[in-house]
Amino acid sequence: MSHHVTFNDLPQGGEKFEPAKGGKIIGALGLVGVLGLVASAFFFFTKTDTFAYSWLFAVFFTFTFVVGGCFWILLHSASNSSWGVAVRRIWENLANMILAMGIFAAPLLLPQVQKPLYEWMGHHRTAMEHAAHADHPTTVKESLHHMSVENPHLHALVTKFGYMNLNTWFSWYTRFFLYFLILWYIARTLRGKSLKQEQDGDIKHTISARQFSCRWLLFYALTVTFAAYDWLVGLDYLWFSTMWGVYIFAGCAWASMGLTILVITWLRGLGYMKKVVTDEHYHLMGKLLFAFTVFWAYIAFSQYFLIWYANITEETRFYLTRNTEGWRWVSIFIVIGHFVGPFLLLLSQPRKKNPVVVSLVCLWILFMHLVDIYWNVIPERGPSLGIGVWVPGAWVQDIAALCAVFGTMGFLYLRGLAKYSLYPWRDPRLIESVNVIN
């Protein structure tokens, strides 16, 4: 920037987004969302078994951006960072999409969707029926134990009953609602403190947000970890990984930062935030992208290495499935596209400071995150349904679900930017953020 920016250089009341200015992209996302919803409704009623995997893929992919936005607000507040003040409202808007996200996740509560996705739930429901009609008082766990005599694989469900169950106080259903409640509470509380500060400009709201974030970071971490286990690891109840929660978290943080950069670049192209966000902010966000590129690779390799070294049948199946037929090439592509490519592109400081270049890298990052989530969910579909490695034509269902969820959520998110100022204009540290040099 050519000079030191002061509060007098910024518009009173901040900058309010006018949806009409971004009408083309917003309208396109809305249209894609509507078409996707119509197609998804058709597939839901005609091809429920295969479409259930498509919907889970689309929901979880979109969910990662929402929880990623929540993470960046928590980290920004807990670390008492000042540079992120200028872009914090973008994260707040993203995190506060959690209720809309819950609506899209609601179909996962339906038995007809759970049946093809989670085999263990079918066994539990059978055990519940046996327990209900038993001649003498029998618990569901005891019923599962009796069933495991004929099917030895069910011994795993007996062992994991305390976590993988449908009828206790800590059941899958209880946790499902708890995840959204916790994330909603975090997002709503931090947004509330931010808006109160716009009324009086008092630093006490910043201090309060920091104290709140330090307490709730742990609950956030547990929420993301447990949700990742329930929705994805549960696809194969025999499989387990101690690295899974961190693996998913790394992808959430990586992709949500990429989306943040893209949204800011888009807004600046429309004439917003030009005095607030500088090349220095792009450099800082680019460095975080680079850091999480390496961190994700470290966690992904660690998970693979631990499973390869232990060579336990229940664990190795995950990678064996993804090294079969065409999935092997997808696995290799992820190694190159998710790590090697972004790593090399983000090494250079000038590239990280160039909004156009770093935004193009972010487009690639979003695509690779999509491939990564697809690779984690979809390979389970064919074997679980007894169809084979690939399900012919199911990719159309995957695209329909993605358009429905991501398109609609994108439309709602961009429209929601108009509700408040694009940056917290009365935050006492805003000027420090605007003039940041690193």
Where are these regions (language model features)?
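Central hydrophobic cores of alpha-helical transmembrane segments in multi-pass inner-membrane proteins
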Residues: H3-L10, G36-L37, T62-S81, L183-R188
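Hydrophobic cores of alpha-helical transmembrane segments in multi-pass inner/ER membrane proteins
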Residues: V66-I73, I103-P107, F176-R188, A250-T265, ...
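Short, highly charged, low-complexity non-transmembrane loops/tails of multi-pass membrane proteins
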Residues: L422-N438
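Central hydrophobic cores of alpha-helical transmembrane segments
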Residues: A105, V356-F367
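Long, contiguous internal "core" modules enriched in hydrophobic/ aromatic residues
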Residues: G13, A20-S40, M128-I334
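Membrane-interface transmembrane-helix boundary segments in multi-pass integral membrane proteins
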Residues: W244-I248, E314-V335, S384-Y413
